[in-house]
From Swiss-Prot:
Domain named SH3: residues: 789-850
GO annotation terms (biological process): endothelial cell morphogenesis; regulation of actin cytoskeleton organization; ruffle assembly
Chain positions with Phosphoserine modification: 22, 392
The name this protein goes by in its record: Rho guanine nucleotide exchange factor 26
Keywords, ordered alphabetically: Cell projection, Guanine-nucleotide releasing factor, Phosphoprotein, SH3 domain
Record function comment: Activates RhoG GTPase by promoting the exchange of GDP by GTP. Required for the formation of membrane ruffles during macropinocytosis. Required for the formation of cup-like structures during trans-endothelial migration of leukocytes. In case of Salmonella enterica infection, activated by SopB, which induces cytoskeleton rearrangements and promotes bacterial entry.
Annotated region (Disordered), positions in chain: 1-49, 86-233, 288-310
Organism placement in taxonomy: Eukaryota, Metazoa, Chordata, Craniata, Vertebrata
InterPro entries in alphabetical order: ARHGEF16/ARHGEF26_SH3, DBL_dom_sf, DH_dom, Ephexin-like, PH-like_dom_sf, PH_domain, PH_ephexin, SH3-like_dom_sf
Species per Swiss-Prot/TrEMBL record: Homo sapiens (Human)
Domain of life of the organism encoding this protein: Eukaryota
GO cellular component, one term: cytosol
SUBUNIT field: Interacts with ICAM1 and RHOG.
Gene (name only): ARHGEF26
Biased composition (Polar residues): 173-192
Span of domain DH: 439-623
Length: 871
């Protein structure tokens, strides 16, 4: 068959490093004289001399020129194997390769032996001192014919996608006079053009091959000691390795190049600038596409220069996402078939650092006493009492274990519970006491641990902010007093309270009761809380003013907040802590009351303590509201200009309920016709009076009318009702033509400042704004109170700060009863812990669906509101 060869070796045990395509004719080989031994220098710098082998019928390798078939005219071009071994060799894809290219290719490289081994029985070669290799004549070997096996060379054609070499020795026929070091593939056509001076193996110059030429892959060793190396594996579409994965294409040859392939013809690129790299693109196989003995070399050359590296983006993404699999581990079986192994250890190190931080702190807390140091304590900003949790009565251990397996969305504070204390574990108290008593101990210990966290935050506020001379120099004494008020007195009161709580805990790890301590300090020590909460209005306004108008204050404040002791928390989060703490105390004490047996003497003491803390909360709320309302009244009164009979606005019993701008549709009579106009009005609604004004500027309003609140009637109206009404007037028609997007309602003033009845058609910008105005204006109407047991309950999952008087400020874990909801995203509700009503956005709340939890919340609200104090 054309293009095939019958290969004969001089010994069965010799591993040849060349390929045969055809058997040259006897007259072409035997009719030549023996030339002088040729010496040449290999590309790696080693001088090599080929000596003739004194054996009958054998020739030197240098005498047989290589015949290179060409596809254009089916002629053969004779080349010297020595020249091919020293120069770059042409391959089927039009590129060139040098003998040392196998060192860069993990699939084609083999280990080099330090010296030539001695002859062994069976016809192995022997290396004498002069460097000549004597090849004994073996018996005639069989002739290899197609179909080809993995041990036979495959012709390199453009249809094949992978080129390789054999891995097992093939016998060579000596009867035909072929040398063991010969490499002269034959062509299907005997006509050809011979090279000049074939005896010396010279070639005029490098032969440029086109992309259509079919060139066999020819390899010769660059050193003597490579004669016994095992050839690489044939990786072709017909090899067992390729057949193992089915009829998949490995890679196209056009991609196996170091240089960037452009759209233009690249055949003019210098051959020495191109390096062929063939590598399997198949990943995830059970084993590599080669022999086991070559696995180590495949791994060693993964990152060799010129190698084909693909999939870097996807690999780096997987490395950033998939954590826990070591891509760089030498034991990883997946590494052998990966195209690229980018080193991204930084991602894994950061993950280990931050993921282990919580576990380290948790272990430190579990094995220590109650409070061993501030470095392990949690600031009160990050502390969440279980008493505020709607599921606090349920077992939380399985829930915590389940949440650890998932991504934690909200910050989970690291703190100890009573069951986690080392003394409790050592004595086994959590297993010996009843479940109800254990929950009671947890509730008592939560008061102590939360007070410790709260005290720590107060000390940071005083040490880092209040006592900072640099910060004090940026503001006046009045501003500093409004900003920090009596925070030092509040901190001292908290310290006294905590000292007694901690002493009770140190006396006995099994705490009997703390209700007496809470009752005593609430009645006598916590008076500074009322003063501090009363100053809240001035505090907030002063801070906003300093941040807006004082750059030096803002710069120093930012520097202090970034200090590690402040843990990157803003100063405002420290300033509001006393208000947060005083409002949480009733819930903590109520939890203890629930866990205390009602027939026990401790229950009565606990109820008295709950009543005292509820009274404290009421005093703080009233003080804050009174100061805010009084200041607001004076501010508004100074901005009003009465064009009519003045109204005495300032009063200690009056406060602002809602304010805002609305669109009024007014009907005027001109001569014998009516005209409807649209104008903007600004309402100031107080708890007992409505002031109707027209806005002149941001701080100036002209009063047009006013009326007592009990003289107002409000009603909602829709577009359909207005258009279908038989008594539709011109103002309604004006609305239909010009303001179809507005949300309308009617306001009837039974008696205004002139004892006249006035009807107004008003429009709001949003549906929720209309609902809020209707609720505020009609709040005094005698409506029966809704049944709280039938109301929807929601839990606050995001804190919300009120920006208008009718809005409700909420903290995380607050429970609110919903009275009405608007489709554009607002709730009106009542806060469970103190009965305050107001509006807040839906996105801050999550509906409670568990009926048992709803019933418990209703019972708790009844207990808190039944203490004859507004908690």
């Amino acid at each position: 068959m054309d293009g095939e060869s019958e290969v004969d070796f001089s010994s069965n045990s010799i591993t040849p490093l060349w390929r045969r395509r055809s058997i040259p004719q006897p007259h072409q080989v035997l009719g030549r004289s023996k030339p002088r031994p040729q010496s040449y220098q290999s590309p790696n710098g080693l001088l090599i001399t080929d000596f003739p082998v004194e054996d009958g019928g054998t020739l030197l390798a240098a005498q047989i020129p290589a015949q290179v078939p060409t596809a254009s005219d089916s002629r053969t071009v004779h080349r010297s194997p020595l020249l091919l071994g020293a120069q770059r060799r042409a391959v089927a894809n039009g590129g060139t390769a040098s003998p040392e290219y196998r060192a860069a290719s993990p699939r084609l490289r083999r280990p080099k032996s330090p010296k030539l081994p001695k002859a062994v029985p069976g016809g192995s070669p022997k290396s004498p001192a002069n460097g000549a290799v004597t090849l004994p004549a073996p018996p005639p070997p069989p002739v290899l014919r197609p179909p080809r096996t993995p041990n036979a060379p495959a012709p390199c054609t453009p249809e094949e996608d992978l080129t390789g070499l054999t891995a097992s020795p093939v016998p060579s026929p000596t009867a035909n006079g072929l040398a063991a070091n010969n490499d002269s593939p034959g062509s299907g056509s005997q006509s050809g053009r011979k090279a000049k001076d074939p005896e010396r193996g010279l070639f005029p110059g490098p032969q440029k091959s086109s992309s259509e030429q079919k060139l066999p892959l020819q390899r010769l060793p660059s050193q003597e000691n490579e004669l016994l190396e095992n050839p690489s594996v044939v990786l072709s579409t017909n090899s067992p390795a390729a057949l193992k994965v089915g009829k998949q294409q490995i890679i196209p040859k056009s991609l196996a190049s170091e240089i960037k392939i452009s759209k233009s013809n690249n055949q003019n690129v210098e051959p020495h600038k191109r390096l062929l790299k063939v590598r399997s693109m198949v990943e995830g196989l059970g084993g590599p596409l080669g022999h086991a003995g070559e696995e180590s070399e495949v791994d060693n050359d993964v990152d060799s220069p010129g190698s084909l590296r693909r999939g870097l983006r996807s690999t780096s993404y997987r490395r950033a996402v998939v954590s826990g699999f070591d891509f760089d581990s030498p034991t990883s079986s997946k590494k052998k078939n990966r195209m690229s192994q980018p080193v991204l250890k930084v991602v894994m190190e950061d993950k280990e650092k931050f993921s282990s931080l919580g576990r380290i702190k948790k272990k430190m807390l579990k094995g220590q006493g109650t409070f061993d140091g501030e470095e392990n304590a949690v600031l009160y900003q990050n502390y969440k009492e279980k008493a505020l949790d709607i599921d606090s009565d349920e077992e939380s251990e399985p829930k915590e274990q389940k949440s650890d397996e998932k991504i934690v969305i909200h910050h989970k504070p690291l703190r100890s519970t009573w069951s986690q204390l080392s003394a409790v574990k050592r004595k086994g108290l959590s297993q010996t006491v009843s479940q109800e008593e254990r929950k009671r101990q947890e509730a008592i210990f939560e008061v102590i641990s939360s007070e410790h966290s709260y005290l720590l935050s107060l000390e940071i506020l005083i040490r880092m902010f209040k006592n900072s001379k640099e910060l004090s120099d940026t503001m006046t004494k009045t501003e500093r007093h409004h900003l920090f008020s009596n925070i030092t007195d509040v901190c001292e009161a908290s310290k006294k309270f905590f000292i007694e709580l901690e002493a009770r805990h140190q006396n006995n790890i099994f705490i009997d009761d703390i209700s007496d301590i809470v009752e005593k300090h609430t009645a006598s020590t916590f008076d500074p809380y009322v003063k501090y909460c009363t100053n809240e209005v001035y505090q907030q306004r002063t801070l906003q003013k300093l941040l807006a108008t004082n750059p030096s204050f803002k710069e120093v404040l930012s520097r202090i907040e970034s200090h590690e002791d402040c843990r990157n928390l803003p100063m405002i989060s420290f300033l509001i802590l006393p208000m947060q703490r005083v409002t949480r105390l009733p819930l903590l004490m109520d939890t203890i009351c629930q866990k205390t047996p009602k027939d026990s003497p401790k229950y009565e003491v606990c109820k008295r303590a709950l009543k005292e803390v509820s009274k404290l909360v009421r005093l703080c709320n009233e003080g804050a509201r009174k100061m805010e309302r009084t200041e607001m009244m004076y501010t508004i009164n100074s901005q009003l200009e009465f064009k009519i009979k003045p109204f005495p606005l300032v009063s200690s019993s009056r406060w602002l309920v809602k304010r805002g701008e609305l669109t009024a549709y007014v009907e005027d009579t001109v001569l014998f016709s009516r005209r409807t106009s649209k104008q903007q009005v600004y309402f100031f609604l107080f708890n007992d009076v409505l002031i109707i004004t027209k806005k002149k500027s941001e701080e100036s309003y002209n009063v047009n009318d006013y009326s007592l609140r009990d003289q107002l009637l409000v009603e909602s109206c829709d577009n359909e009702e207005l258009n279908s009404s038989p008594g539709k007037n011109s103002s309604t028609m004006l609305y239909s033509r010009q303001s179809s997007a507005s949300h309308l309602f009617t306001l009837t003033v039974l008696s205004n400042h002139a004892n006249e009845k006035v009807e107004m058609l008003l429009g709001a910008e949003t549906q929720s704004e209309r609902a809020r105005w209707i609720t505020a204006l009609g709040h005094s109407s005698g409506k029966p109170p809704a049944d709280r047991t039938s109301l929807t309950q929601v839990e606050i999952v995001r804190s919300f700060t009120a920006k208008q008087p009718d809005e409700l400020s909420l903290q995380v874990a607050d429970v609110v009863l919903i009275y009405q909801r608007v489709s554009d995203g607002w709730y009106e509700g009542e806060r469970l812990r103190d009965g305050e009503r107001g509006w807040f956005p839906m996105e801050c709340a999550k509906e409670i669906t568990c009926q048992a939890t709803i019933d418990k919340n209703v019972e708790r609200m009844g207990r808190l509101l039944g203490l004859e104090t507004n908690v």
